[in-house]
Amino acid sequence: MYVERIPIEVPTRAPTGRTACYVLGREEALLVDPPAPDERIEAELDRVGSVAVTHHHPDHVGAVAEYAEAADATVWCRRGRAEAFTPATNATPDRVFSEGTEIPTGGEPVVVRDTPGHAPEHVAFETPGALVSGDLAVAEGSVVVGDPEGDMRAYLASLRRVVGLAPERLLPAHGPEIDDVRATCERLVAHRLDRERRVLEAVEAGNRTVTDVLDAAYEKDLTGVEDLAGATVRAHLEKLAAEGHVRWDGARADPA
């Protein structure tokens, strides 16, 4: 399938400072994650038939309404998430998708794959040989999975699921394409499990608040990203509590 990748500078916490949107197919194409108006997207609108997003974060949805109207395109939304989709995008969905839905293009359809974790509605779009993966994975560094929307257990399950799908490459929203899918997903799983271990050790050592756990579990300088790191610690504590390893009431953590 023909894939056009268009990286666009937008206000984002991602290190690249850009979000890539994708045009999938040559005719009646699917436009994925248009983050902001851009003349390169506008040049493709005459062949766009549908618009969808991997999830609702602002750096992925900024031009959904504008380009759906300009292309007279079908707007797709995750089933059960329309109430969140409309205020995020200023667009009303025409159709809904769920796991396995085939979104038609002029050629082969694009298949929806559930990949929650980074956000509850997060999906990926499967084309022959590639998976448009949104914020599921990055070639370098890690992905923020932060409370309240982030679900660490779901995120790890999504990474493992993608390994099982075995796409030839991942097409992420931030950073370069990912050719070694298995190695990247396994690296991200290992990173999260190592952070989880550090969080658990911090709680067992007597740290009770998110701030205290943060100081104990992170060795690097968190200047400018303390809020993201704190949200990540809370997501780890939610997972550890669900699995019976700690007691966590949203403010205080104790060993189980």
Where are these regions (language model features)?
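Active-site HxH/HxHxD metal-binding segment of metal-dependent hydrolases
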Residues: 10-17, 34-107
